[in-house]
């Protein structure tokens, strides 16, 4: 039997582009724990591969996602006074070959892949 959620029945990766092109603020999410958070950047990669603007895809996993969750006063952009939770990638996280090499939580390095 099909285990898909009914609300996702017609979702494809070009849905992000179609909504974004119509001026809708799109947040790319993973529905963790159903699809783990580790796949968030892969979802952004797939959205770009299917036509979404790369800058909009990056915002969809950062600032727009924070805005849509009403927490953009704390996270989503790099600004003085916001939480210092940062992931450092080898390239844009919207590119398949990109790897997360460092993670900071509250300004403290918690992961450093060297």
Where are these regions (language model features)?
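C-terminal cap of metal-dependent C-N hydrolases
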Residues: 79-114
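His/Asp/Glu-enriched, well-ordered alpha-helical/loop segment
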Residues: 1, 5-89
């Amino acid at each position: 039997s099909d285990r898909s959620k009914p609300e996702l029945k017609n979702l494809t990766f070009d849905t992000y582009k179609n909504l974004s092109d119509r001026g809708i603020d799109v947040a790319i999410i993973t529905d963790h724990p159903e699809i783990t958070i580790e796949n968030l950047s892969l979802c952004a990669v797939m959205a770009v591969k299917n036509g979404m603007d790369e800058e909009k895809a990056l915002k969809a996993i950062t600032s727009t996602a924070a805005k849509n969750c009403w927490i953009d006063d704390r996270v989503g952009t790099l600004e003085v006074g916001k939480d210092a939770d940062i992931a450092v990638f080898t390239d844009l996280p919207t590119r398949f070959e990109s790897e997360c090499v460092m993670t900071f939580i509250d300004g403290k390095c918690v992961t450093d892949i060297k």
